[in-house]
C-alpha cells in the first residue's frame, strides 16, 4: 500500500487548477536525485522511511476499524447460535502464531482495490477539467481586451479631431494677443526707463541724505557722550567741594571756639598763678589720688610692644561705639594726653568699685552690656605739665632716651622745673609717648599751649602733627551735644586750675602729694587716655551713639578713694589700661613736682561715642637689682585671645574691660615712700609687694561699692583676666575656689565667659568645678561656647566638661555655639562628641539655631562634619579622606561626603511646628535653605501648627528655590531635518541646535509647558535675528510673535518629548514632570516644517535666509518657470536652488502630480548638444507631434558661469520664453534628422551663476530669464553671516546669549567685519570677480576661551581662498588692455614686475585694512599669528608721484617716507631679484605706486613678521614700472583706499593696546598714506601714539620748496591727530593742494563712509 500511495503522488498533483499544477510540475522537473549529495540522500531516505511507517500504521488502523464495521453489517443479523458467527469468533480467538486464512474472502481487500481505482480515475478527470477551464478563461480575457482597445481607439480619434479644431482657434487668438501685447510691452518699457531714471535720482538723493544724517547722528552722539562725561565730572567735583566746604566750616567753628577757650584759660592761668594757695597734703581727703613713685637710679629703657592696627577686641559692639584715637603723626611738641582728657577712664576703678564689676558680670549669658562710668568732676587726671621729647618709632624695641634728658640722679625738692628732666618711663600705644620737656618753657605755659593746639590733622610749621585738645569731643555726632560740650568745658577749667602750682619752695597745694617726700623719685608713671584728635580725620561717617547702659547711673557719683600703690620696679610693670576698650598710656613726667596724680574723669557713654584705640604696650625695663613683685606683671594674661568672627561680646556684662593698669616704680626708701600717705600700707596692692603681712584689711574706705571679700575678688580677677592676682589668690589657703555669687557665676564661669584662657587654665589646674552651673543652668562650657571663645572651649573639653549639658531651657553648648555662629567652637564640640539631636524646651535643635542666625558655615559643619575615629585631634589623613572642609564648599560637599544628620533631625519641628526649612525660608536665608535642600530626606511639604509649608512662609527668593528644588532641566533643541544629503553648501549647517533648558517643576501644567515651549522658540528666533547681542530676557519685552527671519511657533512641524510625539496644547494624563521622569526624556526636540511639507521654515533656520525672501523666490520659480540665481562665489546659490526644487517637488506631489528633479553641472566642456540631450531625455523638450506630458520636471543648471551663456542658451531662448507648439524650434538630432520641439508648461528651469554681474555677450540672455541677484551688501546675504554666527554662538553657549563684552562675541564680530571690509575693499578695487559670499565664513569656529583658533582658521582661509582669488582678479584687471602679445593668459602665467608689485601691495592693504584690523587678540598674541598670513610682508615703503618729470636715482623728494620706526638705510629694503642696476632712469615712470608710502615696515616689525623678510621692497628704479593704464588706475585706487576716511585704517593695529577695534586715520604705522583731510575725522586723540620728530616735520608745510614742488601733484601723507596742533593748523591754512584734494575726493569718500557706517550698524 505504501508503494501504491507513493505512486499516487503524480496523479494528485494534477488535482489543483492549471497554474498550481504547472508550478508543481516545474518544481518536480527541477528536483533531480542525481544532484543530491550523500547527506541529502540520507536525509531523503530517512524521511521516506518515516512516511512509509506512518502509512502502514494508518492502514492497519483503518483495516481493523473496517473489519469490525464490515462484520457487524454482514453478520449482525445472526444471533449467538449462528454457526457462522461462532466459526468467526473461534477463528479470531485462536492463538496461533501464523496468520490464518479467513473463513471467507476478505471483503476489505476488495473494497480497497475498488476505492483505489476510483481515486485514480477521479484525479485524472479533475486534472483534465482544470486545464480546460484555465484555457477557457484566457480566451475570454483576450476577447475582452480586444474589444476595449477598439473602443478606446475610436474615442481617441474623435477627441483628436476636436482638439485640432480647438487648437486652431486658440492659436488664432494667441496671435492677435501677441500683437497687442508687443505694442504694450514697448510702451511699458519706455515708461519703465523713465521710472528707473527717476528712481536712480531719488536713490542718489536718499543716499546723500542718509550720509548727512549718519554723520550728524555720529557727531551728536559724540557730543552727547562728552557732555555726559563732563556732567559726571562736575557732579563729582561739586560733591567733593561741598564736603570740603562743610569740613572747613566745621573746622573754622571749632577753631573759633578754641580761641575763645584759650583766651579764657590764659586769663584763668594768670589769675590762678597769682592767687592759688600753697599746696597742702591732707592725709585723708575726699579727692584721694593714686601716686606712683619711681627712683631714677639708672636710665630706664622703654621697650615698646606696639600694635598700630586695630585689635579685634572682645566686643564687636565696642568697635562701633568707641572713637578711634590713634595719633596720625608723632609730635615732639605735644604730650600724649592732656589734662582732663575727655573720655579718660579711671585706672583704679576696677579695684575701687568691685560692686560695679560684680553687678555688671551678672547679666544674661549672651546679652550685650558694656559698663559706662558717670562723669565726675572730682575724678580726673591731673598733670603738672606736659612732657615733651624725642619721639622714636613706636615699633622699635628700645626707644632712645631724649637727647636732653639728664642722668637719673636724686633731685632735691627745690630744683626748679626748668632744670628738672627725667627719662621716659612708661608709654602705651602712642608714637609720641616718649617725649622730653622743652627746657626753656614753663610747664604751665606748655600745658596751656599744648592744650589749645590745633587739630591732630593740622601739621605745624615743623611738619609735626599736634593732637587736638582733649577738652572737647571732636567726633561729628557730639558736636551738637551741648551737654557734653558744657561738661568738657567745666572739666577743662578745673584741670587747668591745677596747672598753676607753686614754684620750687612754695607750699604744696591741697590734694596733691608733697614733692618733698618724693624728690628723689623724679620719674612718675601716669595713666591717661589718648585724645580724640584723630577722630576728626573722617567727618563723613560718624560712629553710632551707643545706647544707655542698664544699671548704671548717668549722674556723677561721689568720688571714691583711690588705690595708692608703691611697687618695686626691678621688674617691668605693664602700664596698659583697657578702659572700655581704651588703652590708657602712661608717659613719663619730668616736672619737679614729680608726682602725677592719677585720676580719671569718667564721662557718660551716651554723650561721647568712642571707638577702640590701637593698643600697644610699652614695658619699661627698670634698673637691675630690684625685685619685681608678681603684681607688677599682672597684665600679662589680661588680653583675651582675639577670636575672628565673633558675633557676641566676649565680656558683655562685666567690667573686666577696666583692669588695673598702674605704673609701678619702686622707691629706694620704702619707709619714706609708704610714709607719704598714711594708710598706704593697708592697700591690697601695696601688701602684694611684700610690705603688708595680711591681705585681710579693708581695701577701701568711704566708697559706695566696697569689695565683699576674697571670693568676690577672685571672681573679679577671673572676669578681668588678671592672671597675677588670680594666681596669688589661688595660692591662699582656705579660699573657696568654687564660690558662686548670687547669680550662680563662679570664677571659672566668669573667666570662660570673658575668654581669659590663662585664667581658665589656672582655675582648672586648681581643680575648680568644671561643670558648676549658674542659677539658669549654664556651665562654663556653655558660657565659652556662647561667646565664641574656642580656646576656652578646648580647655574645658580637655578637662572633661559635660559636653551635652543642657541648661534650664535645654540649651546645650553646641546649641549656644550654633547660635553664636563660631565654627571653631562647633567643630571642637562635634569632635568631642556633642549630640546634634538634643532639643530645647521649645523644641529647637542645634540645626534650628544655626539656621536662625543664617550662618552657612555652622550649618555645613552640623550637616557634614564627621567625628574623627581616634581622639579629638584632627589628623591630616582624616581631613583628606572625606571630612567636610568649609573652604571646599565649591566642590559640592554632598558629592564628597553624605550628610551626617538624619532626616528626622532635619525635619524636626519645634513647638510651633516649624522645621529648620521653615525658619530659613521665612527669614530669607537662601544659602541655608539650599544646604538643607541638599539633604535627600528633607520634607519641604511638612506643615506647621497653622498648616503652612515652608513655601507658604518663604520670601520670594526662597520660594523660587523651593519651586525649583525638584525641577527638571531638559534641553530644548531644534532639529533641522534634511530629506537627502546634498553638496550644496549645507555642510556648515548644524543639524541640531540647543536653544535653552526648560525648567519643569512638579506643579507645572501642560498649558504652562506649552506656553514655555512656544515662548522659548519665539525668544530664540528673535535673539538670533536681532541686530545686536541681546539676551533672551531682553527680547521677551518684544511682543511680536514673528522674528525678523519670519520664524515663529507656527513654523513647528512636530515636537518629541524624548521619543514620544507631542504637539503644542496637547495634554497627557500625567503632569509634565511625571511624564518626563517616567519616560526618562533627556531632551525636547522640535522639528521645523521643511520642503517635504511644502514649507521653507527649516531651510530658513538652517541657512538664516529670511522666510519671506525664500517664499518670494519660490513664487518667482512657479510664476516665471525660468529663474537664474547669481551672486559672488559662496552666496549659497546652489543650496537655495536645491531647497526650492525640493519644496516645489513636494508641493506638486501633494497636488497629485508626479515630479522629478534633474540636475546638471556645467563646465567649460559642456556643449549645447549635451544640453539638448538633457532637455529631450528629461521630457522637458518634446516633439511637436507628441502630446504634452502631465509630469512636472525641474531642471537645475549649476555653475553656468563656467561657460558662455550666449553660446549655450542662444537656441533655447525663444522656445523657453514662448512655451507652446506655436513657437517650435527645430533641432538636429544625432542621426542627422531634424525635428521640431517645444518646451511644455510643466517644465521649470533654474540656474546658478557664481558671478557678481554679467558682462559682454552674456547680457543678451538677461531679458529672457528672471534674475535673482544675491548681492553681498544687500539682503539676504548681508545679514546672513551675522545671524548664522550668532546662532552658532547661542548653540555653543547652550541656548544663552553671551554679553557683548564676551571674547566670543568680539571674535565673531571681527570675523563678520573681515568679510564686509574685504568685499568693500575689493569692490573699490574694481575686481568684482574676487568678491566672496558668506559661505566661506560659515565654518568660522566658535570656541569659548580660544580666540586664537579663529585667527588660525582665518589665516587658512586667507591663504587658501582669499589670496589666490585676489591675485587672479588683480592680474586679470591689470592685463585687460594689454596688446595681444601680452594677453591675459600670458600675464597670469608670467606677470610683470609691476603687476607683481601691485598684487603684493593689494594683498598687504587688504590684509591690514580688512583682516588684521579689529582683531580682538592682544598685540603680543596677534603678532604670533601674523606670520601665518601670506602677503603681509610687503613693506610698501616706496612712493612715487604721478607727474612725469624724471628724477635722478638718488633724489627722493617724491618718494617721501613716513616711518615711525627708527630710520633704516635704503639698502636694507632692496630685493636682489627685482634689482637691475643698469636700468636707465629715463624708463622710470612716475606713474607708479606714488603714495604707496606705507609704513608697513614699522607695523610689521611690531608684529614680528618683518624680521623674516625685511628686504621685500621694490627698488626705486625697477620697482613699479607699470605697463598699462589699468595698472596706474589700480595704483590710484589703492592710494584712495588708503587715504579714504570711510575705510578702516590699519594704523591702529600697532597702536592699540589690547583692543584693536577702534581705528584712526592718524597713521602711527600706516600701510598707505592717509590724506591730510583725515584731520577732520572725529577720532579720539588719546588713542594715537605720538610721532617721531621727523614725522612732525613732514606734517607741517615748512619744507624745502624743491621737495614741495616735486610732490605737489597729490599728497597722501598721513597727518597724525595726536601730535601738536600746529600741524593741522598749518595744513589747513597753507596747503591749497590739500584743500583741493579734499574737495575732489569728498563725494567718493562720503559714499564709502556711508557704506562703512551701514555695515557697522549690526555690530553695535
Swiss-Prot record:
It holds the Pfam family Ank_2. Residues 1-26, 203-222, 366-440, 454-478, 499-596, 872-897, 1445-1477, 1617-1660 are annotated as: Disordered. It is found in: Cytoplasm, Cell cortex; Cell projection, Dendritic spine. Residues 875-892 have a biased composition (Acidic residues). The keyword Cytoplasm applies. ANK repeats lie at residues 709-739, 743-772, 776-805, 809-838, 842-871, 912-942. Residues 1641-1660 have a biased composition (Basic and acidic residues). Residues 119-276 form a coiled coil. Residues 411-422, 583-593, 1619-1640 have a biased composition (Polar residues). Residues 386-396 have a biased composition (Low complexity). It comes from the Eukaryota. Keywords: ANK repeat, Cell projection, Coiled coil, Cytoplasm, Methylation, Phosphoprotein, Repeat, Synapse. Interacts with CTTN/cortactin SH3 domain. Interacts with STRN, STRN4/zinedin and MOB4/phocein; this interactions mediate the association with the STRIPAK core complex and may regulate dendritic spine distribution of the STRIPAK complex in hippocampal neurons. Activation of glutamate receptors weakens the interaction with STRN and STRN4. This is Cortactin-binding protein 2.
Amino acid at each position: 500500500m505504501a508503494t501504491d500511495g507513493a505512486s499516487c503522488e503524480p496523479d494528485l498533483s494534477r488535482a489543483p487548477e492549471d497554474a498550481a499544477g504547472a508550478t508543481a510540475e516545474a518544481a518536480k522537473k527541477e528536483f533531480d536525485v542525481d544532484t543530491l549529495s550523500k547527506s541529502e540522500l540520507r536525509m531523503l531516505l530517512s524521511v521516506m522511511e518515516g512516511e512509509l511507517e506512518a502509512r502502514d500504521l494508518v492502514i492497519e488502523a483503518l483495516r481493523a476499524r473496517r473489519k469490525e464495521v464490515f462484520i457487524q453489517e454482514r453478520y449482525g443479523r445472526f444471533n449467538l447460535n449462528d454457526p457462522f458467527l461462532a466459526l468467526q469468533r473461534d477463528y479470531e480467538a485462536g492463538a496461533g502464531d501464523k496468520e490464518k486464512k479467513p473463513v471467507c474472502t476478505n471483503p476489505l481487500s476488495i473494497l480497497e482495490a475498488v476505492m483505489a481505482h476510483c481515486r485514480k480515475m477521479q484525479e485524472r478527470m479533475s486534472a483534465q477539467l482544470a486545464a480546460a477551464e484555465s484555457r477557457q478563461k484566457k480566451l475570454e480575457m483576450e476577447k475582452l481586451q480586444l474589444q476595449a482597445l477598439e473602443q478606446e481607439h475610436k474615442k481617441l480619434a474623435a477627441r483628436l479631431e476636436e482638439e485640432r479644431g480647438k487648437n486652431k482657434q486658440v492659436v488664432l487668438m494667441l496671435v492677435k494677443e501677441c500683437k497687442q501685447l508687443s505694442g504694450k510691452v514697448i510702451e511699458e518699457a519706455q515708461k519703465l526707463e523713465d521710472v528707473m531714471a527717476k528712481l536712480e535720482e531719488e536713490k542718489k538723493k536718499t543716499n546723500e541724505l542718509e550720509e548727512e544724517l549718519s554723520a550728524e547722528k555720529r557727531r551728536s552722539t559724540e557730543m552727547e557722550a562728552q557732555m555726559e562725561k563732563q556732567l559726571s565730572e562736575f557732579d563729582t567735583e561739586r560733591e567733593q567741594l561741598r564736603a570740603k566746604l562743610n569740613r572747613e566750616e566745621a573746622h573754622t567753628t571749632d577753631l573759633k571756639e578754641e580761641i575763645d577757650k584759650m583766651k579764657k584759660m590764659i586769663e584763668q592761668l594768670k589769675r590762678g598763678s597769682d592767687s592759688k594757695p600753697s599746696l597742702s597734703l591732707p592725709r585723708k581727703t575726699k579727692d584721694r589720688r593714686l601716686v606712683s613713685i619711681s627712683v631714677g637710679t639708672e636710665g630706664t629703657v622703654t621697650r615698646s610692644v606696639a600694635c598700630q592696627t586695630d585689635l579685634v577686641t572682645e566686643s564687636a559692639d565696642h568697635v562701633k561705639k568707641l572713637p578711634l584715637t590713634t595719633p596720625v603723626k608723632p609730635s615732639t611738641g605735644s604730650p600724649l594726653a592732656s589734662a582732663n582728657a575727655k573720655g579718660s577712664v579711671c585706672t583704679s576703678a576696677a579695684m575701687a568699685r568691685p560692686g560695679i564689676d560684680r553687678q555688671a558680670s551678672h547679666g544674661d549669658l549672651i546679652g550685650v552690656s558694656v559698663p559706662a562710668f558717670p562723669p565726675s568732676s572730682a575724678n580726673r587726671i591731673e598733670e603738672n605739665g606736659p612732657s615733651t621729647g624725642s619721639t622714636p618709632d613706636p615699633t622699635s624695641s628700645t626707644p632712645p632716651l631724649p637727647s636732653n634728658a639728664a642722668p637719673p640722679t636724686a633731685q632735691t625738692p627745690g630744683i626748679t622745673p626748668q632744670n628738672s628732666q627725667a627719662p621716659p618711663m612708661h608709654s602705651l600705644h602712642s608714637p609720641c609717648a616718649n617725649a622730653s620737656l622743652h627746657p626753656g618753657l614753663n610747664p604751665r605755659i606748655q600745658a596751656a599751649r599744648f592744650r589749645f593746639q590745633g587739630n591732630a590733622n593740622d601739621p605745624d610749621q615743623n611738619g609735626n602733627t599736634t593732637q587736638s585738645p582733649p577738652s572737647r569731643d571732636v567726633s561729628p555726632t557730639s558736636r551738637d551735644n551741648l551737654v557734653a560740650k558744657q561738661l568738657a568745658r567745666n572739666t577743662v577749667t578745673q584741670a587747668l586750675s591745677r596747672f598753676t602750682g607753686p614754684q620750687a619752695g612754695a607750699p604744696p597745694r591741697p590734694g596733691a602729694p608733697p614733692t618733698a617726700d618724693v624728690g628723689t623719685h623724679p620719674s612718675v608713671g601716669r595713666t591717661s587716655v589718648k585724645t580724640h584728635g584723630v577722630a576728626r580725620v573722617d567727618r563723613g561717617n560718624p560712629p553710632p551713639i551707643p545706647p544707655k547702659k542698664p544699671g548704671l547711673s548717668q549722674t556723677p557719683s561721689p568720688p571714691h578713694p583711690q588705690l595708692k600703690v608703691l611697687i618695686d620696679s626691678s621688674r617691668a610693670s605693664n602700664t596698659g589700661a583697657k578702659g572700655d576698650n581704651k588703652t590708657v598710656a602712661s608717659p613719663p613726667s619730668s616736672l619737679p613736682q614729680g608726682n602725677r596724680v592719677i585720676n580719671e574723669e569718667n564721662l557718660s557713654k551716651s554723650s561721647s561715642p568712642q571707638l577702640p584705640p590701637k593698643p600697644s604696650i610699652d614695658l619699661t625695663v627698670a634698673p637691675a637689682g630690684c625685685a619685681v613683685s608678681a603684681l607688677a606683671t599682672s597684665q600679662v594674661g589680661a588680653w583675651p585671645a582675639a577670636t575672628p568672627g565673633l558675633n557676641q561680646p566676649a565680656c558683655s556684662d562685666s567690667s573686666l574691660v577696666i583692669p588695673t593698669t598702674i605704673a609701678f616704680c619702686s622707691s629706694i626708701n620704702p619707709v619714706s615712700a609708704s610714709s607719704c600717705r598714711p594708710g598706704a600700707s593697708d592697700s591690697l596692692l601695696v601688701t602684694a609687694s611684700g610690705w603688708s603681712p595680711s591681705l585681710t584689711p579693708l581695701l577701701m574706705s568711704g566708697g559706695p561699692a566696697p569689695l565683699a571679700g576674697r571670693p568676690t575678688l577672685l571672681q573679679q580677677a577671673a572676669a578681668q583676666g588678671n592672671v597675677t592676682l588670680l594666681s596669688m589668690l589661688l595660692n591662699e589657703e582656705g579660699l573657696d575656689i568654687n564660690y558662686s555669687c548670687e547669680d550662680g557665676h563662679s570664677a571659672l564661669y566668669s573667666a570662660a565667659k570673658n575668654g581669659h584662657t590663662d585664667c581658665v587654665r589656672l582655675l582648672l589646674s586648681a581643680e575648680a568645678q568644671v561643670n558648676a552651673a549658674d542659677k539658669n543652668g549654664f556651665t562654663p562650657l556653655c558660657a565659652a561656647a556662647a561667646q565664641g571663645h574656642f580656646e576656652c572651649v578646648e580647655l574645658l573639653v580637655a578637662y572633661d566638661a559635660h559636653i551635652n549639658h543642657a541648661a534650664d531651657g535645654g540649651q546645650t553648648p553646641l546649641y549656644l555655639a550654633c547660635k553664636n555662629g563660631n565654627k571653631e567652637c562647633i567643630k571642637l564640640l562635634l569632635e568631642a562628641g556633642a549630640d546634634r539631636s538634643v532639643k530645647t524646651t521649645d523644641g529647637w535643635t542645634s540645626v534650628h539655631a544655626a539656621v536662625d542666625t543664617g550662618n552657612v558655615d555652622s550649618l555645613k559643619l552640623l550637616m557634614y562634619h564627621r567625628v574623627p575615629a581616634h581622639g579629638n585631634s584632627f589628623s591630616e589623613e582624616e581631613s583628606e579622606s572625606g571630612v567636610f572642609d568649609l573652604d571646599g564648599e565649591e566642590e559640592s560637599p554632598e558629592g564628597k561626603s553624605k550628610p551626617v544628620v538624619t532626616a528626622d533631625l532635619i525635619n524636626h519641628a519645634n513647638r510651633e511646628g516649624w522645621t529648620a526649612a521653615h525658619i530659613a525660608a521665612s527669614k530669607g536665608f537662601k544659602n541655608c535653605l539650599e544646604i538643607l535642600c541638599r539633604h535627600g530626606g528633607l520634607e519641604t511639604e511638612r506643615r506647621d501648627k497653622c498648616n503652612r509649608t515652608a513655601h507658604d512662609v518663604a520670601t520670594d527668593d526662597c520660594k523660587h528655590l523651593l519651586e525649583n528644588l525638584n525641577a527638571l532641566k531638559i534641553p530644548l533643541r531644534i532639529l533641522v531635518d534634511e530629506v537627502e544629503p546634498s553638496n550644496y553648501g549645507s555642510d556648515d549647517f548644524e543639524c541640531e541646535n540647543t536653544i535653552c533648558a526648560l525648567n519643569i517643576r512638579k506643579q507645572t501644567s501642560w498649558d504652562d509647558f506649552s506656553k514655555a515651549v512656544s515662548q522659548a522658540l519665539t525668544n530664540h528666533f528673535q535673539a538670533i535675528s536681532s541686530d545686536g547681542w541681546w539676551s533672551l530676557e531682553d527680547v521677551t519685552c518684544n511682543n511680536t510673535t514673528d522674528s525678523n527671519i519670519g520664524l515663529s511657533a507656527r513654523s513647528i512641524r512636530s515636537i518629541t518629548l524624548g521619543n514620544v510625539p507631542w504637539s503644542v496644547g496637547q495634554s497627557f494624563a500625567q503632569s509634565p514632570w511625571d511624564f518626563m521622569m517616567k519616560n526618562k526624556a533627556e531632551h525636547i526636540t522640535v522639528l521645523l516644517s521643511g520642503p517635504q511639507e511644502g514649507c521653507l521654515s527649516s531651510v530658513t533656520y538652517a541657512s538664516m535666509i529670511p522666510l519671506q525672501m525664500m517664499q518670494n523666490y519660490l513664487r518667482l520659480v512657479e510664476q516665471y518657470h525660468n529663474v537664474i540665481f547669481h551672486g559672488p562665489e559662496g552666496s549659497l546659490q546652489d543650496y537655495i536652488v536645491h531647497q526650492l526644487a525640493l519644496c516645489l517637488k513636494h508641493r506638486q506631489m501633494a497636488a497629485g502630480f508626479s515630479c522629478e528633479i534633474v540636475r546638471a553641472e556645467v563646465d567649460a566642456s559642456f556643449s549645447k548638444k549635451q544640453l539638448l540631450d538633457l532637455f529631450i531625455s528629461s521630457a522637458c523638450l518634446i516633439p511637436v507631434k507628441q502630446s504634452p506630458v502631465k509630469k512636472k520636471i525641474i531642471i537645475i543648471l549649476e555653475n553656468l558661469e563656467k561657460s558662455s551663456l550666449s553660446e549655450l542658451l542662444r537656441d533655447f531662448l525663444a522656445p523657453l520664453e514662448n512655451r507652446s507648439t506655436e513657437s517650435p524650434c527645430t533641432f538636429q538630432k544625432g542621426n542627422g534628422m531634424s525635428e521640431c520641439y517645444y518646451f511644455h508648461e510643466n517644465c521649470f528651469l533654474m540656474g546658478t551663476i557664481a558671478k557678481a554681474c554679467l558682462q559682454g555677450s552674456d547680457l543678451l540672455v538677461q531679458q529672457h530669464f528672471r534674475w535673482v541677484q544675491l548681492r553681498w551688501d544687500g539682503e539676504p546675504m548681508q545679514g546672513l553671516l551675522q545671524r548664522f554666527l550668532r546662532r552658532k554662538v547661542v548653540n555653543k553657549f547652550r541656548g544663552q546669549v553671551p554679553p557683548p563684552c564676551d571674547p566670543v562675541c568680539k571674535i565673531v564680530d571681527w570675523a563678520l567685519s573681515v568679510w564686509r571690509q574685504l568685499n568693500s575693499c575689493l569692490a573699490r578695487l574694481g575686481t568684482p570677480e574676487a568678491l566672496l559670499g558668506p559661505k566661506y565664513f560659515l565654518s568660522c569656529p566658535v570656541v569659548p576661551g580660544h580666540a586664537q583658533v579663529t585667527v588660525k582658521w582665518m589665516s587658512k582661509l586667507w591663504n587658501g581662498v582669499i589670496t589666490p582669488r585676489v591675485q587672479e582678479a588683480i592680474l586679470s584687471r591689470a592685463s585687460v588692455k594689454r596688446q595681444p602679445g601680452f594677453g591675459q593668459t600670458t600675464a597670469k602665467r608670467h606677470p610683470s614686475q609691476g603687476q607683481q608689485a601691485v598684487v603684493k601691495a593689494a594683498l598687504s592693504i587688504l590684509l591690514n585694512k580688512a583682516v588684521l584690523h579689529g582683531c580682538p587678540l592682544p598685540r603680543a598674541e596677534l603678532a604670533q599669528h601674523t606670520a601665518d598670513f601670506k602677503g603681509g610682508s610687503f613693506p610698501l615703503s616706496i612712493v612715487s608721484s604721478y607727474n612725469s618729470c624724471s628724477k635722478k636715482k638718488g633724489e627722493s623728494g617724491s618718494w617721501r617716507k613716513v616711518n615711525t620706526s627708527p630710520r633704516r638705510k635704503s639698502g636694507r629694503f632692496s630685493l636682489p631679484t627685482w634689482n637691475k642696476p643698469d636700468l636707465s632712469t629715463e624708463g622710470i615712470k612716475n606713474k607708479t605706486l606714488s603714495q604707496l608710502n606705507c609704513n608697513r615696515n614699522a607695523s610689521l616689525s611690531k608684529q614680528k613678521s618683518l624680521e623674516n623678510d625685511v628686504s621685500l621692497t621694490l627698488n626705486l628704479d625697477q620697482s613699479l614700472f607699470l605697463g598699462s593704464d589699468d595698472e596706474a588706475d589700480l595704483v590710484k585706487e589703492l592710494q584712495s583706499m588708503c587715504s579714504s576716511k570711510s575705510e578702516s585704517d590699519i594704523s591702529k593695529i600697532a597702536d592699540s593696546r589690547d583692543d584693536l577695534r577702534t581705528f584712526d586715520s592718524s597713521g602711527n604705522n600706516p600701510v598707505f598714506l592717509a590724506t591730510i583731510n583725515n584731520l577732520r575725522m572725529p577720532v579720539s586723540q588719546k588713542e594715537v601714539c605720538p610721532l617721531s620728530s621727523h614725522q612732525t616735520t613732514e606734517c607741517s608745510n615748512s619744507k624745502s620748496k624743491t621737495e614741495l614742488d616735486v610732490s605737489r601733484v597729490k599728497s597722501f601723507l598721513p597727518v597724525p591727530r595726536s601730535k601738536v596742533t600746529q600741524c593741522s593748523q598749518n595744513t589747513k591754512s597753507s596747503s591749497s593742494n590739500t584743500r583741493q584734494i579734499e574737495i575732489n575726493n569728498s563725494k567718493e569718500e562720503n559714499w564709502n563712509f556711508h557704506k562703512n557706517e551701514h555695515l557697522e550698524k549690526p555690530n553695535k
